[in-house]
Every structure is written in C-alpha cells, then in structure tokens.
Amino acid sequence: MMCFFFFSLQPCLFKLPLPLPLKKNTAMLSFWNPYLRGFKAPTPATKSKPKASTIYHRLIPKCFKKDERENGGIFAIETAIPPTAFYLDSELLVLPENKSSLWANETLGNCHSIQELMFHVYDIVEVVYAADRCDSIPPHLQADIVPSGIVLKLYGRTETNQSVCVNVFGQKVYFYVYNDSYSNLQRDVQHILQETGHRSTGLHLCSTQKKFLSGYSTSSHEVYQITLGSSSAMRSLASGLEQIGYRVFEANVDASTRFIVDNKFSTFGWYTCTSPLARPRVHQDAHTHLEYDCSVGDIQYHAERLDWPQYNILSFDIECLGESGFPSADKDEDMIIQISCVIWTVGGDKKQECILLSVGTCDLIENVKVYEFPSEMDLLYGFFTLLRDYGIEMITGYNICNFDFPYILNRAQNVYNIKPEDFSKTKTNSLFYVYTPQEGNFMRSHSKVKMSGVVVIDMYQVCRDKLNLSNYKLNTVAKECLGEKKNDVSYKDIPILFKGSSKDRAKLGMYCVQDAVLVIDLLKHFMTHIEITEIAKIANIPTRRVLSDGQQIRVFTCLLAAAQERDYILPMPVTGSQEGYQGATVINPISGFYNTPVLVVDFASLYPSIIQAHNLCYSTLIKQQDLPKFTNLTANDYETFMISGGPVHFVKKHKTESLLASLLKTWLAKRKSIKKELEQCQDAKMKTILDKQQLAIKVTCNSVYGFTGVASGMLPCLMIAETVTLQGRTMLEKTKQFVENVTVEYLQKICNFEVQCLPQHPNPKFRVVYGDTDSLFIKCEGFAMDTVIKFGDALASHTSSVLFASPIKLESEKVFKCLMLLTKKRYVGILSNNKILMKGVDLVRKTACVYVQEVTRAVLELLLRDEEVKVAAQTLSYSPVANCFKTEPLLGFLKIIDILNQSYSDLKSNKVPVANLTYSTELSKPFTEYKTTNLPHLAVYKKLAMRNEELPQIHDRISYVFVKSNGHLVSDMAEDPTYAEQNKIPIASDWYFDKIIHGVANILQCVFNNNTSATVEVLYNFVRNP
C-alpha cells in the first residue's frame, strides 16, 4: 500500500476507492498524516532527507478527516515535510535535490562552448550585473559589468528544440542633451550621479549634430550624447539635468529598444551567435536547458527566416473552494483545489498534453495526467515549478490577468510566504507580479501580469477586442467562435464535489481541464500567438508588451528607428495637459426607411492616407508664430490649415518628405508585397504568418494618428491630430457635394458602359443620407441593385481621382438592398448578399427576456424581407406621424400589427412558457449592503427569505418573472419563476406586452420621424387591447 500524508488524525484513518475506468497498480490510496502523532513516513528510494530547518505551513480541509467529511473549514499544520505530489504509483518530491523540480528534464541541459549557435528569440529581458558577478562570467566580458552594467537576456529555442538563454554583454543606454553652453556639463553630470547614488557606470560624453523632431528645421544642433551602463542611472541623470535647464531627448528609451533599433534586429526571430561561451551550471542565471554568454558584436539577425521553433504554450484554469459564496483569495478557507494545465507545442507533431493538479485523491481521467497533492501549498509549488521548469514560453487562459493569476499570487504570498519571482525564467532581477491600475484610471485599463521570460496572453481581453457579444463568458465566446458548448459547473457545486469521493473530484477536474482546452482552441481560432509576434516585429517591441502596453509604444519605437536614419532625435513628453481638439465628426443622418439601394463608399486607410497626402509630421510642422523665420519658403512650399487654435502650416513633400509619411509609405509598400506573396503561397503555416504580418502592418499604420492625438502620450502633437480630423471632415463634405451633382450622363462617361435606370424613375439621382468618419451612405434612387453594384467601384475611383491627392482612395465597400437609418452610428439593413447588418443597434436590451427578443426579431425580419411591409414603411417615413391617426393603415403595416396582436393573445392565454418570460440579475453584494431593496431581484430575495427557502449567494443570478400584483412598484410584481409556475400565478401580461411594444418601437422609430414616443403611440392605436 502507498501512503499519502493527507492529514487525518491517525494513520490510515480512511481510504478512498480507486478509479474504475483506469486502474492503478496499487489496490487503494490512503489519506494519512503520520506527523501529528510522531509517526515517521516511509521514505521512497528516490527521496532525500528534507532539511530540518525548513518548516512548511499547510492549510488542510477538514473534510479530509474521517469524522468531518461533510464539514467545511480548514485547520493548519506545520511540518518539515517538503512539497510533495503523487502520480500513479509514485510519491514525488516537488523540489528534489537532484534537479530543480519534478518537471525538469536535466538530460537536455548538456551545455558546452561551440563555434556558432543558431537560435530563435521570443523575449528579451534586461537585468543588471554588478562587479561581484565577475567570477561567473568570461574574463573578456567582465569590464562590461564593472562597477555594474546591463545584460540583455535573449530567451528562445535552438534548432534542436532546446530552451536557451543567451546573455548579451556590452549594450549601453544613452540619451541626448542640448543647452546654450556645455562648459559645465561634465561637472553637472558627475555631481548628479554622485547625489543620486549612481556610479559613473560606462559613462561617456560625446558631441554630435542632430535635428530636433519638434518642428520643421533645415539645420542641425550641437548636442551631447551621454552613454551609461545603467537604465536607472540614465533616468536619474536625465531628470537632474532637465531640472537645471538642459533640454533632454530620448531618455525614455531602454536598453532592449536600443539593442533592437540600433542594430536593426527583431524582438522575435532567428539569430546566430558567434563563439558563444557556455555558462557553467553552478553559475547559470536562467531556468533554461542551455545558457551562453556573448558580446553585442557576436549577434547576427536572420530576417529571411520566418519559421517558428517548437514553442510551448500553456493554457490553465483554476478551481477554488468558496463555501460561503464566491471565492475570495483573502479568506484562508477559500483555497485553490485544482489547476488544469493544457500544453500545446506550436508546430510540433505531438498531441497537446493535459495535466490536472488536484488537492486530494482524484480518479484518473482519460487522456489527462493527474497529479495529486496533500494540500494547497503542495499544489502551488507544483504549479509554480511547472511554469518555471516545463519549458513554457507563453501562458494563456481566460480572464487570468483579473482573476486566476491575482488569486494564485495572493494565496502564495500572503498565506504561504512563497515568492513567485523565484519561479520565472530569470534568476537576477526576476519579476512575477500582477500590476493593477489604480482606481480612476482610464476605463479600458486592465490588470497586467509581469513575468520575466514569459509571454502572457489573456484570451478574455483578446475576445473583448475582437467580438461584439452580449456577454463575454467563456461559454458564450466558445459557442460563437468554436460552435462548442461548455459543460459548466456552478461554484456552489464545487465544495460538494470536492468533499465527495475521488470520482467526484475527477468530475470537477474534467470541467477544469475542459476550460483550459477551450482557451487553447480559441487561441488557435484567432491565431493570437502569431498575430502578437508579428505586431512585435513590426513595432520593435517585446511580444509580451503587445497586449498589455497599448498602441503608443508601438509607434514610438518605429518613429525612433525612422528618426535615427535621418539624424532626428525625439524630445521627451511634456508634462501637463494640452488643449483638446474637435475629433472626427459625421454628416448628420437623414433618418428614415430606404427601400432603395444604398451604396456605401469609404476611404481606404483614411487617416494614414491624409498624413501621406499632406506630408503631415513633427518634422514638417511650422507654427504660425514661427513662419516668418523661414524666409526661404514660398507660399507653394507649404500647406496651411485652419484649426481651432489658428492657422498651422506643413512643408510640402518637394521640400522635405515627412518622417511619418515616409514611415507609412514603407509599411504600406511592405504590406502590398506581403499580400502579393500571400496570394501565391501554398503552405498553410506560412500563409497564416504572412496574413498576420499584413494585419500587423495595418493595425500599426492605423495607430499613427492616435499616437499624435493623445495629450498624455509619449510624443503628443495635437496640431497634427486636429489637422488630420479637419481634413477628414473636409473630404466627406467635398465627396458629398461632388456625388450629389453626378448625373446619369456623367456616370455613363465614368463607367464606359450604358447605365440602366428603372423605368418608373424618370429622374434618377444620388443623395448622401449619412456620413460617418471615413464612409458615406449614398441613396441611389432610380437604379436597380445590380446596376449599383456594377457602377459602385467606378464612381468611387473617379471621385477620389478628381478630388484628392494620392494615396487617398475612395472605395465601394457594400450595397444595402434596404436600410433603416436611425441616428448617428445606428442603422440596420439587408446587404446585397441578403445578410442583415446591424451597427450600434440592440434590438432590445440585452437583459430582455427571451420572448420579448423573439417577437422583436420577428418584426425586424418582416420589415426587412417582406415587400409589402417595406413599401409601407418607406411610404410612412415620408408622411407626418399625425397622418397615421387620420387614414386607414397600409396593408404592409397591418402585418406588423398582426404579430403584436398575436403576442398579446399568447400572453393573455398563458401560452408563453414561463422560462421565456424570465429575467435574471446578479446579487453583486450582500443583501444588507443594498441601499434600496425595491429592485426586482431583491424583492424575490425577500420573498424567498419569508418562505424560508434557500437563499442565493453573492454573485448568484436571481431569476424572476413579473406576475399580477396589487402593488404600485415594478418590484412588487417580481416573483420566483418556479414558485409562480407551481402556484399558477397569472403573469403580468400587460407589462410584458408594453416591453414588446417599446422593443418594436425602437426598430420602427425611423419610420415615424425618429420619435420613439410617437411610435409607441401609433402602435398602441392599432393593436387590439381587450
């Protein structure tokens, strides 16, 4: 018999049956705690004696005691037994003496110096070595860390699939200063470094000529480049010099960025290292199979290779014990009881590996490796060492930045005094923590996981950015993207399953593993890992910063590289707010129902094309007060724009090409080349990489305008941003005026073919009914759908060639068969392919019950697809609302009334299932903390309490229906659906019908002068109210 020390009060106090489907070699497993009464545990042959000085604190569920199986709560013990796991027949130490952990594969770590190393890099981590590390590195590199110096750790894999860390020595950081006089610069620098406690690490001052990227200039300035071997010293020195009057440039550029930009390297790709020196195992500073040291000059990048090595991506999910409601990491008893780990090897042939870490015995699960742990502490050590030693390069999960990681790190640090930073890839200056934005930060801010040497991808954040759903629960997203439904388990059932048998814990484990598998499938669906690496490559930033650090850093590093090639240096951002400006506006919609083709044309890459066409940039900007300084410029050398602060000028391309325009031109040319290559590509993997490359370029191009327009950004220039939006508005107005003056005769000249007009429309014409930022909606009256589709491209192309300079381009995007135009950014219509397109429109509130949604959708389908209804809707939209009460309703309109009448009849005769009339609202906090209880779900809570029924817990959704009541408040009508159905309580049919009327009115309002109240009145006028 194999003995577990699953803490009971005496040895072998109770036993759990073995799993039935898959059998172990032993007859049974035992919960056993020999340490409470002085018993000694049997020592496995593979086990060494634990260090007596190390005492481990464990929290044990009381349900592990034989006489308290059904009880909740925990008790604490302290023993010298090190973290332990059980796998099949074996008892394992999580941290054995002969290797770093039970997951480590020491046989792969045969590291020796070689002539050349080909390896792929996925992350770059900056650390600082001091002189006391000299004994651990080669002699010729020691000068780079005396008294201290930067070391860049390049993490990746070799061509033979071994994880590797290449430590690059000799990379410096530098910045620039400008002043009227430099006579005291050397003294000022030394004084500031001494005052701030920084030694002159690799200090070097050099005079050079640079142009400032802060306005148009034809001359360079003498500046000093100050080079150091420490980023913290650079920040302190730059701040100190700025305070005494020096103008500072590029002091916000770290060593990794200098390494990439200065050498034209990449943050993700293949490298060669010449003569790498193997780091002795005793001095290894990274948790990788191999580790080498080299100098910056030994590194060469291979841009031609696009293939990936076999990187490991881990998807994980946790299950927590929440006996008194939703789990809270701050409660000792709300422990983590299971962690599922699904490991997918990118580009590998082997099937993804599923691992379940479980507290307590657990039956075997098919295709899952089950590791059992005596306590949560052992489980956490098992998980942390897996992250560190299994060869994981990327970690994903669902909402892991906001829940799973914070929960795990909270438990580890605050309950067990485990240091998470000991379990990242890096030993020196290691990071592993969750950064949570302070309250009041911009609402889109979210928590970020900082983990040295690991890329974290939270698929919850990815799905929120890419999808538009009513909610973003994993089940909803999986159904939308994968067509799969998640088998869910309520957190209320978790304690019951955990306290049950090993079979019950296996059932819980299956749910846990399932969630991690779904997340891996979502990552594969969106190819997020490839997308973020391609963005990282184009933007010169580490992959781990793509999802967490926003758009600003992407453009900044690219601008830095482009500026460097033309001897510009970037100023530091100015603190303090700049005045705002008017953003993109729209041509106000002419609301109504259009039963005629509506052509939608839009500007391809509007803002990037404006920047290119008008040569907008920091490098071409001339403020009004500075214009007299440039006596060599004529009026034809610059373009003037009237923005809110007065005139602003930009030098034209024939004088100097804008830095931003040059950058955009290079990117877009590269994108065009990639798309051409993509058309010819036959390899599926390479097609995915190329597609993500062109998408990364598109995303980065579209970020340039936003980069200039954020007042608190890295290099804001609101004059550029406002000029861009001004031109966008002007272009929309010009296009509107031009298109509305196009005649049939002129259109035929444009198209070079005969344009057919509908015979019942002797005077065909175009009218712009809406303009939205970069697109125009053109009503094509007197033309058939097929004709509009045929001439759309020609009309758009001709308009852009007549009105605008290259590369501004107008394109035919889509054609609506019919369109309901409500208000700005809100419309519904049927496209030429018969699909319904909705923008900014919720047919009904997302919280509405199923029946209200069904009736509303039925009306929408009728309105968009029934010819009689469409004719009636268009006729009504051209008439005053008051006419509806004076004349007989149109036949098509009566079809809508028939649907409403039928719904009312079904409600009155109780034909609608109660389930379809049910609403639900979350109990977000304890009932007693609500300031008012006159809310439907709280009213039901009170009724359940009065009837002594089981009460919902915090974060439960409380279901309710509305029934007939003598009360005056809506909450008085709320009732528990089960109780209402069992007691045959009549539903509040009039209340539900009113919801239907308002839902339908929300759709039909465009027909009745966009007046929802008037629409409701019209509908009530024609329905049959008993």
From Swiss-Prot:
GO terms for cellular component: host cell nucleus. The keyword Transferase applies. Keywords: Coiled coil, DNA replication, DNA-binding, DNA-directed DNA polymerase, Host nucleus, Nucleotidyltransferase, Transferase, Viral DNA replication. It is an enzyme of class 2 (transferase). One of its GO terms (biological process) is viral DNA genome replication. Residues 664-695 form a coiled coil. Its EC number is 2.7.7.7. InterPro entries: DNA-dir_DNA_pol_B, DNA-dir_DNA_pol_B_CS, DNA-dir_DNA_pol_B_exonuc, DNA-dir_DNA_pol_B_multi_dom, DNA/RNA_pol_sf, DNA_pol_B_thumb, DNA_pol_palm_dom_sf, DNA_pol_type-B. One of its GO terms (molecular function) is DNA-directed DNA polymerase activity. The keyword Disulfide bond does not apply. It catalyses: DNA(n) + a 2'-deoxyribonucleoside 5'-triphosphate = DNA(n+1) + diphosphate. It is found in: Host nucleus. Its main location: host cell. SMART domains: POLBc. Replicates viral genomic DNA. Belongs to the DNA polymerase type-B family. This is DNA polymerase catalytic subunit. It comes from Alcelaphine herpesvirus 1 (strain C500) (AlHV-1). The gene is 9.
